[in-house]
Structures are given as C-alpha cells and as structure tokens.
C-alpha cells in the first residue's frame, strides 16, 4: 500500500471491542487490543493516503436484520473503503 500510495485496511469486531463483557473476557481483551492497534495504524498511515477503519457489529450477524444482514454489512464495509471517514463505525448502536 505504501508503494502504491493508497489503500484501505478494515477491522471488523464485535461490541466487546469497545464495551467489555464479563462473560466474554477473551474477546473483550483481544478485540480491545486489536482496536487500539487499528486506531494507531489509522493515525500513523492517514498522511500516506492509507485508510484504516473499523466496523463494530454488536451481537450476531443476522439475515433479514435491517442493520446486521450480511448484504447490509457488506455495503457498510464498502462505504468504509470509499468514504474514508473516521476510524470507527457502528453497524448499530451498542444499546440496541
């Protein structure tokens, strides 16, 4: 990507990436670390036209769900790539 002068890296995580859960200690710790790494990459590579983004999908990917259907999520990932917006985007609010 650096040689090309552009690119996109997308991290996809569950809600425990931003809100730890006592019943999901493993993903709470692992996703938090991955999120921190992604944020650092986002900040470090932005000036090189390399976009790093994260999509948080709270709960399960659910066919037919207006926010978490696989096709809806695929579109959200495409939008993260093309819009080059902020680092973190939520498929739906965490409290939903």
Residue map of PLM features:
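The alpha/beta-hydrolase serine catalytic core
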Residues: 1-2, 86
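Catalytic loop of short-chain dehydrogenase/reductase
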Residues: 2-3, 7-33, 39, 46
């Amino acid at each position: 990507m650096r040689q090309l002068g552009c690119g996109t890296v997308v991290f996809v995580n569950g809600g425990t990436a931003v809100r730890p859960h006592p019943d999901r200690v493993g993903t709470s710790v692992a996703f938090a670390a991955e999120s921190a790494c992604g944020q650092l990459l986002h900040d470090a590579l932005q000036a090189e036209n390399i976009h790093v983004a994260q999509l948080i999908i709270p709960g399960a990917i659910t066919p037919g769900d207006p926010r978490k259907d696989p096709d809806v999520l695929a579109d959200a990932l495409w939008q993260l790539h093309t819009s080059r917006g902020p680092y973190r985007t939520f498929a739906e609010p965490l409290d939903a």
